């Protein structure tokens, strides 16, 4: 199966905006553990929603930025920076 990391980055950005977070490419200096993403990962959507929901409830966090790093041929880590 083919894994489309761009789909998950777009999903995360859209979900962030839908729950009131702003996208800011400068919000890259603080992040929690990256989210595993790839063909074998079952919980990518749950994990993305969980992190973003938690950030949206934190009154000190208003901005996020979402990016990824490739860790293997079809495996990635998704980072959600916040500020």
Where are these regions (language model features)?
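Extracytoplasmic/periplasm-facing segments of secreted or lipoprotein envelope proteins
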Residues: 1-39
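Extracytosolic low-complexity repeat regions of secreted or lipid-anchored proteins
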Residues: 33-83
């Amino acid at each position: 199966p083919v894994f489309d990391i761009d789909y998950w980055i777009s999903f995360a950005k859209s979900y962030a905006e839908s729950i009131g977070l702003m996208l800011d490419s400068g919000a890259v200096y603080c992040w929690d553990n990256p989210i595993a993403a790839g063909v074998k990962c079952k919980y990518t959507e749950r994990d993305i929603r969980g992190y973003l929901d938690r950030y949206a409830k934190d009154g000190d966090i208003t901005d996020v930025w979402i990016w990824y790093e490739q860790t293997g041929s079809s495996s990635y880590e998704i980072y959600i920076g916040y500020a």
